Amino acid sequence: TKANSSSWILEEWKAPRTERAWGFYRVLHTPNPRVKVKELTVNPGCTLSMQRHRYRSEHWFVAEGVARVLTVNMASTDVEDLGQYIAHQALHIRDNQWHQLCNDSQSQALRVIEIQYGEATEEDDIERRA
């Protein structure tokens, strides 16, 4: 129908996509500088970088697909697999905690709702692990 054919335009206008090598994200809501809600879409077989944030924590809610999450043991510096999180499961990432989001599926996109909160929610608050 005509109404449905242009619905993507409204969605794109309200929350434009920011493309990344792993997929894309949309900022859904920013009520103040200390809180931001994003939707991450990770393409099949793709992985975000191992990263941490100094000034914010994150809460991840898996909306669709299966997420695999890795972290770094700060005592041993070994990478640890926190396991898989299926749709409707959630995970808390503390500030300064190394974390990596992976979509191991070769056919289904992973959608995660990310709630960022802390002193600041700026995109440049990121340190990537070599």
Task: Give residue spans per PLM region.
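Classical nucleotidyltransferase
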Residues: 1-22
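A short glycine-rich, His/Asp/Glu-containing loop-to-beta-strand
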Residues: 18-57, 63, 115
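A generic "binding-loop/recognition-motif" signal
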Residues: 46, 55-56, 66, 97-98, ...
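Short beta-strand His + acidic residue motifs that chelate non-heme Fe in jelly-roll/DSBH
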Residues: 49-51, 69-70, 92-93, 99-106, ...
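Short glycine/proline-enriched turns and hinge-like loops at secondary-structure junctions
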Residues: 52-54, 62, 85, 104-106
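A compact, surface-exposed functional segment
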Residues: 58-59, 63-65, 71, 128
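Short acidic-glycine-tyrosine-enriched beta hairpin
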Residues: 71-99
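Double-stranded beta-helix
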Residues: 100-130
